[in-house]
């Protein structure tokens, strides 16, 4: 009986071991294989913009999907220098992120002398839409989510928690507003007004850029710049996107503009092993509550500030 149990345990261990091994083998294969859309020396550059948009590379946690303006702009400049490349496709699946990083990418796209098209496949909201608006043409899936033209600032406040456990916050500052946004004290009316003023300014820049990029009246953009998101069909009616469709419509538009068959090559940022492993893990995993997790990650990395994002 005991021998039989040992045999079962050995069998279970072997099955678990083989499962883990096959999982990591599939990850390694995905790291070193190319998608069917990629070819060498193509005339159309494909650049992915996925996850949270940040300014500097390598600031995310191991399994956090992020796009850095620093890396994306390098890819745009690289494609722009390539005389063979006639057009750039920006494949977007992002909820937005840093206002600064979003504007940096949008400005870099506008500098290029190539045909540019933004492809919102699933999500292209807030800062990601800001980026999309800078392209010559926007194609979005009819059920995709886009728009959400607005700015948000938030922080976790622990003042009530400290008070409950009889912990005091000793405030020693030189400059009355030096600790503005500290999670260990409540915002004063003056501090709240200052933050709201900054948010209003960033929101105005956002609206102004969208209106200019999309050739819309500023007043019309202001009416829909409530932070609300729109599905693709609604966005088309509002003039936020040019065309409803998918990969086929994107390629058709590009070929009409460049006058030749599209030969697409994916421009990708260089990855170290852990970065590549992170992406592969993201592609093979489903994270429940990712938005909530990102909020707590941001606070964990920057506990003494209010983060402003689009």
Question: What is the role of each PLM region?
Answer:
Residues 143-151:
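Active-site loop architecture of trypsin-fold serine endopeptidases
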Residues 1-118, 123-127, 137-140, 153-310:
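N-terminal organellar transit peptides
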């Amino acid at each position: 009986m005991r021998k039989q149990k040992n045999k079962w345990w050995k069998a279970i261990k072997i099955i678990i071991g083989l499962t883990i091994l096959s999982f990591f083998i599939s990850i390694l294969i995905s790291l070193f294989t190319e998608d069917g859309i990629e070819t060498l020396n193509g005339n159309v550059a494909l650049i992915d913009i996925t996850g949270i948009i940040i300014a500097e590379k390598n600031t995310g946690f191991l399994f956090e999907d992020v796009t850095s303006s620093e890396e994306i702009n390098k890819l745009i400049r690289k494609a722009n220098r390539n005389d063979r490349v006639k057009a750039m496709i920006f494949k977007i699946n992002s909820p937005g992120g840093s206002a600064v990083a979003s504007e940096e990418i949008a400005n870099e796209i506008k500098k290029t002398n190539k045909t540019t098209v933004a492809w919102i496949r699933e999500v292209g909201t807030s800062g990601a839409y800001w980026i999309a608006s800078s392209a010559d043409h926007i194609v979005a899936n009819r059920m995709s989510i886009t728009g959400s033209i607005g700015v948000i600032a938030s922080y976790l406040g622990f003042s009530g928690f400290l008070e409950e456990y009889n912990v005091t916050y000793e405030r020693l500052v030189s400059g009355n507003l030096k600790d503005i946004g500290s999670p260990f004290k409540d915002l004063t009316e003056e501090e709240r007004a200052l933050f709201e003023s900054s948010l209003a300014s960033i929101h105005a820049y956002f609206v102004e850029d969208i209106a200019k990029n999309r050739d819309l009246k500023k007043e019309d953009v202001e009416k829909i710049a409530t932070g609300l998101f729109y599905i693709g069909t609604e966005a088309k009616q509002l003039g936020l996107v040019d065309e409803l469709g998918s990969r086929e419509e994107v390629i058709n538009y590009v070929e009409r503009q460049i006058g030749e068959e599209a030969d697409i090559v994916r421009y990708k940022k260089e990855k170290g092993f852990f970065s590549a492993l992170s992406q592969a893990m993201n592609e093979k995993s489903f994270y429940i509550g990712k938005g909530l997790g990102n909020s707590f990650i941001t606070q964990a990395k920057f506990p003494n500030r209010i983060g402003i994002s689009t």
